[in-house]
């Protein structure tokens, strides 16, 4: 079933591949606790001890990594839909 045209399906393919690569890499960097991404963590302003801060930062890093990987999986679904549409459009124009 054709839902979108050939240009939109190709655009969806390109954007999906880029989104998958970017989100997988961001998830990896969050998972290894990259210091450059600490500004993106939902942390409180003050903590009672350094151990509390480290525990909260580790939880936030892991949660952000999982969120990135879940979003990458959603992009895989978009990639599959765009690929199916691209195939359907190329099949129609070949006939």
UniProtKB/Swiss-Prot annotation:
Record's bilayer topology term: Multi-pass membrane protein
Which residues are in coiled coils? Answer: none
Keyword Cell inner membrane found: no
Transmembrane stretches in the record are: 12-32, 68-88
Naturally occurring in which organism (per UniProt): Drosophila melanogaster (Fruit fly)
List, alphabetically, the GO terms of the cellular component aspect. Answer: membrane
**Localization per Swiss-Prot or TrEMBL:** Membrane
Question: Is Metal-binding among the key words of this record?
Answer: no
Q: Which family does it belong to?
A: Belongs to the RNase K family.
This protein's encoding gene: RNASEK
GO BP terms: cellular response to virus
Question: Known EC number(s)?
Answer: 3.1.-.-
Q: Which UniProt keywords apply?
A: Endonuclease, Hydrolase, Membrane, Nuclease, Transmembrane, Transmembrane helix
Q: What does this protein do?
A: Endoribonuclease.
UniProt name for this protein: Ribonuclease kappa
Chief location category: membrane
Extract one GO molecular function annotation from the record: RNA endonuclease activity
